[in-house]
Amino acid sequence: MKRIRHITFLAAFICIIFVIYAIYHSVGQADSSVFAGGEGTKENPYLIETAAHLDNVRNYLGEGYHFQLVQDIDLTAYLDPGGPGWEPIGDNANRFEGHINGNGYRITGFFINRTDGNYIGLFGVIGENGLVRNLSLTGDYITVEGAPALVGALTGNNYGVIDNVSVEIGDGITLSPQSAYVGGLVGTNHGEIWNSNVNSDVNGGNEVGGLVGRNASNNTTRIGIIHNSHATGNVSGQDMVGGLVGNASGKIRYSYATGNVDGLESVGGLIGTSVRIEVDASYATSDVTGESSVGGLIGDVRIDNSRSSVRNSFAIGKVTLPSTGGDVGGLIGTNFSGDVENSYAAGQIEASGASNVGGLIGRQAGGFSSGTVENSFYDEDTTGQSDTGKGTPMSTADMKDRSTFEDAGWDFDWIWGIESDDYPHHDLYFTLTYQADDLDHGDVPSDEIHSRGSVVLVADQGNMSRTGYSFSGWNTALDGSGETYDPYSPVFNSFVMGANDKTLYAQWSINKYDVHFDGNDYDSGQAPLTETILYESEVNVPDQHTLVKDGYTFTGWNTERDGSGDFYEPGDTFRMGTEPVTLYAQWEINVYSVSFESNGGSQVSEVEAEYGTAITEPLPPEKEGHLFKGWYQDELLTEAWDFETSKVSENMILYAKWEINEYTVSFESNGGSQVSEVEAEYGSSITEPVPPEKEGHSFKGWYQDEFLTEAWDFKTDTVSGDMTLYAKWEINVYSVSFESNGGSQVSEVDTEFASLIEEPTPPEKEGHSFKGWYQDKLLTEAWEFETDTVIGDMTLYAKWEINVYTVSFATNGGSKVSEVDAEFASLIAEPTPPEKEGHSFKEWYQDELLTEAWEFERTRLTKI
């Protein structure tokens, strides 16, 4: 008891630690990648096709979740072979409350290898709302060290319903002698187990069973039920060891065990120990070995205010008690409070040292709750016993005689059967056949064997499907006129098996599917109302109703939003399929014309554009003398069109906006004085500027070209672009006069401005030498004919230098008289007369002939 209290405390502690987990794992929608499909509902369960999908169930423990296997699942590659193996789904604080349908598929490669722990199995704990059915679990081994409690291949603890589950663990379940509540299928069962079996050896400590470690009952709301189930593996343990159940309360019906059972105390071929148990139509063929309270069917039936019962059951295995002391019975070792009725034992008993040995019951205790035996027998030949008062001994021949049992009131119509030279056996089992016509997919549930009078949970839909129909249950008549069973109903999901084979026919109801109309991004109006149509009925496609989508024209309906599916025009028809249909309004975008009014500019071609799209800006038009300023949406040019953001929404005209060009008119004066440039609009005239000035030139007007061929008329010509007007000049012709200053006359000449003039023949002037021409009267600035140019009417002045002559005196034989120099027209002083011997000087003469005298006082020098 101390150990059990410790386990209870540990379970409570685990519950506290994991309470938060339950908060975060209540009912909710799973991500689409977590399972192979489905929505987790009864009608559309989550689909499990991989080990990862199975592992994800632990995240969806809440009530209302439904799961279904769609293929065999191999855990071999998923589990680390050197690791702890499978981690149980859920625990006592977070129980599995959903429904999982194995659909007849197998989970293979399962193993558990842990150092400690409680609530060990594929599931940790199956809750009161949980259901696991139609599943096969095979694996290598289950081992847990230490002192684990609540260990079973399927679940450590069951509060829900287990139906049609089979387990086969190759190397069995092996736990320490300190373990407790160990079963091949379930550690402890508070719920219901139907039509299930285990083919595995189980080795544990206390409360060890081939199917269930403990089948519990609290006499109130929860009664452990085992129905039509069996275990075929060998079972060994310490105390309370049974081929089917180690410690049993509740109800066990139509079940059996065939494996050998070995333990110490309370060891039985079917049940180790029991209290408040009802065993009906069950048996064991196990060889049983123990040291105290050892029975071919039950080790002991303990004292309790509520009585136990064993009816219509038998044991035929060998029972051995190798030690001394203890109780040994072919059916029950020790019976304190059990009522045994219509049951028998026929196995060999070896218990020479036992305290109490009986062919049927070893010890029948007395007192207020003592057990009773009625119409029950044992084979005195095979058991080697002959005790009475706790079962009637019969010979082997009598035990194989039907009358022996009929005389005792045994029911050979409903329960028992007997063949020649054999012991009575249960004639309880009948075949339940499922039949389903017109299946398109899946398998009809396999035939089931059920005992007469047992409650049968009908199979669910499994993987059966019929196109366009929903499974609505089973009926005993093909046309549905018989009894109806609904596997998903809490009330009409079962029946009591009668004394005949039974066939159930799948019933199908034709599906109705919605045809929904989606406006598909419409802007206003209303789509047609959703229609509900029977499978394969004709659907008439309506028009758009009042739907409007701005800028689009309705073209019909499509099964895909993007138009990639089936297209229907209003008035078309189609056959309703197997899924709801959404028809999406199809819209063809309107194409509008965009014209360009260039307002006097070059032509721009119109373009077509879809509604709501931008258009590419065309090449700007051209208009002489104008600058293009963009396109506008209105004739008044108040609202500009933005080609990046503005969208076409109708047929439209864009209007060109122009800004008249302002041009610069420059004046090239061609060497004249500068004339300022002016600004002028295209097409306007300009005011003639003040004429420029240019030395030596006369301004002859402005011209449009450098070659001065096209004159600009300021009255009529207009500006059409940036331009330069060029000044035209006519070079001046000037008169050059020659003032010879007393010399001979020199003719004037005409010459152009800045030109050189040819030097004229020098003038002559008596007694003078010509010294050049000068620009001024004062003769200070000489004129250089080679470099100086004419810049205006002018007079050049001759410069003269008076001649200086040498006057020589020829004395004609007289004394020498020095010559003198004298300017032209000057008087010379008379020199001292010369002397000539013998002569008188008379005077000087101008000529050798001495005819013309020189008068020094008045004759001026004019020539030499």
UniProtKB/Swiss-Prot annotation:
Subcellular location, in the record's words? Cell membrane
Q: Does the keyword Transmembrane helix apply?
A: yes
Gene3D superfamilies linked: 2.160.20.110, Listeria-Bacteroides repeat domain (2.60.40.4270)
Name a single GO cellular component: plasma membrane
Q: What species is given as this protein's source?
A: Evansella cellulosilytica (strain ATCC 21833 / DSM 2522 / FERM P-1141 / JCM 9156 / N-4)
Q: Where is the composition biased (Polar residues)?
A: 383-395
Q: Where is this region: Disordered?
A: 372-399
What NCBIfam families has UniProt attached to this entry? List_Bact_rpt
**Topology class, membrane:** Single-pass membrane protein
> Looking at the Swiss-Prot or TrEMBL record, what is one Pfam family this protein matches?
Glug
Q: Which UniProt keywords apply?
A: Cell membrane, Membrane, Transmembrane, Transmembrane helix
The name on file for this protein is: Putative Gly-rich membrane protein Bcell_0380
Q: List the residue ranges forming a coiled coil, or say none.
A: none
The protein's superkingdom reads: Bacteria
| Regions that span the bilayer | 7-27
